Amino acid sequence: GVLADQWKEFFYCDSMPPDVLMMKGQKRTGGRSSNTGGEDNIISNGSVIAVNNGQCMMIVDQGKIVEFSAEPGAFTYDASTEPSIFCGDFKEGVQRSFESFAKRFAFGGQNPKNQRVYYFNTKDIIGNKYGTATPVPFRVLDERAGIDMDIGLRSFGEYSYHICDPVLFYTNVCGNVEDEYRRQELDSQLKTELLTALQPAFAKIGAMGIRYSEVPAHTMELADALNEVLSKKWREKRGIEIVSFGVSSITANP
């Protein structure tokens, strides 16, 4: 009942496995607490929410974001205040996203029916394999030798990414999941878009005068080029971006 839900609770999230991108927080009541009737999706005013390193926390109220914290420590929920944000190491874009999507509801004395604490994995998501099924065009340009031609490249390797804007990630990707959201649900789409972006990214590398055989030594430039190509789909819509792009092998087809 409503009275049972007014007891303070403690929300936390254990260390998230590397394949989990978002997880619903776990509720713990004190050993002396009689809040046995508290509902899982109700957050009592004054509840404490723990945030560990490599995580950020978000409170949603009937699907709308009301609190956000990326700073490790203990966060105390105060339902009477305006929505708050503690960005931690995140860029100011998270602040703008929060201001766009956050909202405080007034319930006229009635408790909300669906509040949740979500935790996001802010560590680098590594080991994402990619491979070109067909050759990707690459421009070979050498003005001194008078060479200007296209060749096909096959490339294989791994890349890593991270969630750079959890507000966008929640709003446009995972939403109100019941328990957790795993990378496998997103992998296929990301891989397809990454391979599509390789062609314009290779074009940027080629325009810099980098030979195809030198590409493995210029993976930072390639990662920057991919982020530039993918910025609208990944960073500005989903709140994720490439951290590193590794090339384990690259071969040319004339």
Where do the model's predicted regions map?
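N-terminal hydrophobic membrane-entry segments
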Residues: 1-254
